[in-house]
Regions:
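Contiguous domain-boundary segments centered on the initiation and propagation of an alpha-helix
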Residues: 295, 534-552, 556
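Short, exposed "boundary/linker" segments that immediately precede the start
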Residues: 4-13
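Amphipathic, heptad-repeat alpha-helical segments used for oligomerization and assembly
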Residues: 219, 389, 570-583
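Structural alpha/beta core scaffold segments of enzyme domains
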Residues: 1, 14-501, 557, 594-600, ...
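Conserved phosphate/anionic-ligand binding catalytic regions in large, soluble enzymes, centered on
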Residues: 104, 108, 224, 350, ...
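N-terminal amphipathic, basic-rich helices that act as targeting or association modules
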Residues: 1, 38-39, 247, 475, ...
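Generic long, charged, amphipathic alpha-helical segments
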Residues: 370-373, 552-576
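Short, highly charged C-terminal tails/helix-capping segments
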Residues: 608-623
Length: 625
């Protein structure tokens, strides 16, 4: 059996466990509520569809060694599994990752085909290459979401939330892996940015005859935001309150230091100013004018009606187990710098971001900084790039390593220039005595001196490495406003505007942040309006290529309006939080809320995603009778 549509979501072959009451049942949970609003929400199964499918080039090396080129988000994690599967000494296996055509969480997994290709290469003593076809990728690569949520929200008549109760059914696919615990992340973020005094949450993961579920951009957090943001809109409708005002009434207050406990009790938020993000999004969207335009269309009975959707979110980045990252910085004899890091970029722009960090601290031009990553022979350890963790962990490791190099260089320069280390400052191409530019030692000279100088108290080499430990997760947040236009005669939905205000702490490079926002929003919109992995009555996949799987292109999407607020975290020296998944978390509920807002005049309360033309048209026809 399999999850395929809203009629069959309770059918499954095997439950992995009894429902887990992680938040113990609360006796009389809704006793003080005037109203209890109930909703059943489906987060349909979607595919990551990276531009580059999985593949490997396995190259035998002398002495029984092997080099494997793979498109991975976490080459060091794969390295350990790979060596174990091959029965090799890890020192004899080198895993390398070149430019990767997208990951989105799906390429954090280890593929069994890697073992087959490597074994073939060893047996033939020649390189072996394997690359998935698109159709193979659509059924073999782990997929995402696949949750059904049963949500109850208790409120006072004025819109104040009294309690939240959720039961989540998660489809893990055929083999229990990451998908079997993704509902835990949903639980962690269940109450979102709101003050919810009581929470009761339980979840169950089940096995189905389908492709396994794994991490997909957001991994459990978009599902949490979807549930709370949808039920809030339904509550606003029930109570006759504007969707913005019911949110504003229940937002957690601004806080600037860790200590704000999430309603789940599983997360300690670091910093947040949720109302500021909401206010900024409403201002940029001109919310009042949008409502006026909507009222005009409704009054005129226009065929094309406007819908306005709002969502406010908070998410967890660098989750537990992902706080530590390796970094090293080394100055070479020619004055150039190499930075080593255990993250593994696949489109995020780490070369630019991490070079900026080194350049800022050491005063070396960015074009003289080389980033070394994604190679287990050159970088001794690493946790990879996932969970929006890279800048706050890997970037901080590079930052601290750069500081270590600078401190060592100052001590060396002080001895060479016969000055106090406190008087040594950055100069043009090296270090100098403050106020005396003529007394300067170039970086190349410092490196050469450090290599074999034997100066008392300094180790040889101008290098510093560290395993940075962020100790806790950070919590980015934001607010999105979506505007859709629905043709009530055909059911066609067009996203005409999408405004996003995302807060990822202190921003290092605005252009890189914008890129992450745009990509994430596109994937979030795709889930709301287009994408859906489907199976036929016998469990055969019927969306196994891009002719059948409705992945939008730029032609279906507007130019997103992206902005930021900055609320730095205290958990790392950069003040940075993650940004890679924020777009998917904020956009999906905003777009779905916009669709339901447009359909509310027909009395339609809910509609499962994706809001395809067929579904919207059918809902309108049913409502019209």
């Amino acid at each position: 059996f399999f999850f395929n549509d809203t009629a069959t979501t309770e059918i499954y072959t095997l439950s992995l466990h009894d429902a887990l009451p992680i938040c113990a049942p609360v006796e009389g949970i809704f006793d003080d509520a005037d109203v209890v609003v109930k909703g059943r929400f489906v987060n349909q199964r979607v595919a990551g569809v990276p531009m580059e499918p999985n593949g490997i080039i396995a190259v035998p090396e002398p002495g029984g060694k092997l080099t494997a080129w793979i498109p991975s988000q976490a080459p060091h994690s794969v390295h350990g599994e790979f060596a174990g599967a091959l029965g090799m000494d890890p020192a004899d296996l080198r895993v390398r990752t070149a430019a990767v055509g997208g990951g989105f969480g799906s390429k954090a997994a280890f593929m069994v085909e890697f073992i087959i290709a490597a074994k073939a290469a060893q047996a033939l003593d020649r390189p072996v290459k394997w690359t998935e076809t698109r159709s193979e990728n659509m059924v073999a690569m782990v997929q995402g979401r696949a949750q059904v949520q049963f949500v109850e929200l208790g409120l006072k008549r004025d819109g104040t939330i009294t309690a939240l109760k959720e039961h989540v059914l998660g489809d893990a696919g055929a083999y229990p892996g990451t998908g079997s615990f993704l509902p835990f992340f949903t639980h962690t973020m269940a109450t979102g940015v709101y003050n919810i005094p009581k929470l009761e949450f339980d979840w169950k993961a089940v096995l189905t005859n389908t492709t396994s579920i794994g991490a997909y951009r957001g991994a459990g957090r978009p599902e949490a935001t979807q549930a709370i943001e949808r039920i809030l809109d339904m509550a606003a409708d029930e109570l006759g309150i504007d969707p913005v005002e019911i949110r504003r009434k229940n937002l957690l207050p601004k806080f600037e230091a860790p200590g704000m406990m999430a309603g789940s009790g599983l997360a300690m938020y670091d910093t947040g100013d949720y109302e500021a993000a909401l206010d900024a999004a409403l201002a940029h969207a001109d919310y009042t004018a949008l409502r006026a335009a909507q009222a005009e269309r409704r009054a005129s009975g226009a065929t094309k009606q406007l819908g306005i959707g709002v969502s406010v979110y908070v998410e967890i980045t660098a989750p537990a187990g992902m706080h530590v990252e390796y970094g090293a910085v080394e100055v070479l004899d020619d004055g150039s710098v190499k930075a080593y890091v255990g993250t593994s970029a696949h489109g995020q722009g780490h070369d630019t971001a991490f070079s900026m960090i080194v350049s800022e601290i050491l005063g070396v031009p960015m074009d003289k900084v080389t980033l070394v990553q994604s190679d287990t022979a050159l970088v001794p350890r690493g946790s990879g790039t996932m969970g929006s963790r890279s800048l706050q962990t890997g970037g901080s490791a590079v930052y601290r390593s750069s500081e270590g190099v600078l401190d060592k260089a100052k001590q060396l320069a002080a001895q060479l220039l016969e000055a106090s280390p406190d008087d040594i400052v950055l100069g043009d191409g090296g270090l100098q005595v403050a106020g005396v530019p003529a007394k300067l030692v170039a970086w190349g000279e410092l490196s050469a001196k450090a290599a074999g100088s034997g100066i008392e108290g300094l180790e040889a080499g101008l290098r510093h490495e560290i395993d940075f430990d962020g100790t806790q997760s950070s919590f980015p947040f934001g607010a999105h406003v979506a505007v859709v236009e629905i043709d009530t005669e055909t059911g066609r939905v067009e996203l005409v505007r999408h405004v996003a205000v995302d807060d990822c702490g202190r921003i290092l490079n605005p252009m890189l942040v914008r890129g992450q926002q745009h990509g994430g929003i596109a994937q979030g919109v795709a889930q709301a309006l287009y994408e859906w992995v489907q199976y036929d009555a016998d469990g055969n996949p019927i969306t196994a290529n891009l002719m059948d799987y409705a992945m939008p292109s730029a032609a279906e999407l507007p130019s997103f309006e992206t902005y930021n607020t900055e609320t730095p975290t205290h958990l790392n020296p950069l003040g940075a939080k993650g940004i890679g998944e924020s777009g998917t978390i904020g956009s999906t509920p905003a777009v779905q809320n916009a669709v339901l807002d447009a359909l509310s005049q027909f009395g339609i309360k809910n509609l499962d995603m994706p809001a395809s033309s067929q579904r919207v048209w059918a809902a309108i026809q049913e409502a019209r009778g």
